[in-house]
Amino acid sequence: MHDLHGERMSARETRAVGGLALVYAFRMLGMFMVLPVLATYGQDLAGATPFLIGVAIGAYGLTQAVLQIPFGTLSDHIGRMPVIIVGLLVFAAGAALAAQADSIWGVIAGRVLQGAGAISAAVMALLSDLTREQHRTKAMAVIGMSIGLSFALAMVVGPLATRAFGLSGLFWLTCGMALLGLLIVLLMVPRASTTLSHRESKVAPQSIGVTLRNPQLLRLNIGIGVLHAILMASFIALPLALVEQGGLPKEQHWWVYL
């Protein structure tokens, strides 16, 4: 990786960016794979209703939103690595809980626990710790690309994996991906010698109120919230429409997403 002025990232920076991008990708792939299949396969769970299936699809977002800033702040005090490691273990535990569930409530509990592994802020902070200022934009762009690619891949892999292994098997696969991400953190990602304060990742408690009242950010936050709500709602309606209106068996939905 190199910038427009020809100065290349160091080997350590490249390893950090690649490792953290993989951690992000495996975590997000595991999170997204369930989206195109839960509305159809989830109907076989005890107590399942369209509303509760929708709750299961979006439940992770609630705990993730609530815990994202606290986890980021915690990483300033105890270090990035411990927060990321614990977050991945919590995410894996949530996937394991959902994999063993035989009711929709068990899946909801697992998804809530998955969202509690909110490591995004800590990962971005560690990325800032491990890269120089002139390379930080490129590093964050790589992370962004890994998220986009994992979403696209999940739309195909999710239906295929569920067809092969069932919904429980899909959650076990998600658990395995989280543990693989943990191995990458432990074996590939360099250790930061110091925990620095960065404008990209720092939380200033005294500014939270001002930030929440900022009109431009309010419009942005509401717009993004509506966008995500529509996206999650589409994964409740679209798979069912493909089966009931389109006559397409749920085992073949991956063709549509491909």
Named regions from a protein language model:
Residues 61-69, 151-152:
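Residue-level signature of mid-helix packing/kink "hotspots" within the transmembrane helices
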Residues 25, 94, 105-118:
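Hydrophobic core of transmembrane alpha-helices in multi-pass small-molecule transporters
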Residues 110-148:
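Cytoplasmic helix-loop-helix junction between adjacent transmembrane helices
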Residues 36-50, 236-252:
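Short amphipathic helix-loop junctions that connect adjacent transmembrane helices
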Residues 2-14, 190-221:
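Juxtamembrane intracellular "pre-TM" segments in multi-pass secondary transporters
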Residues 13-40, 217-230:
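Pair of pore-lining "gating" transmembrane helices in MFS-fold secondary transporters
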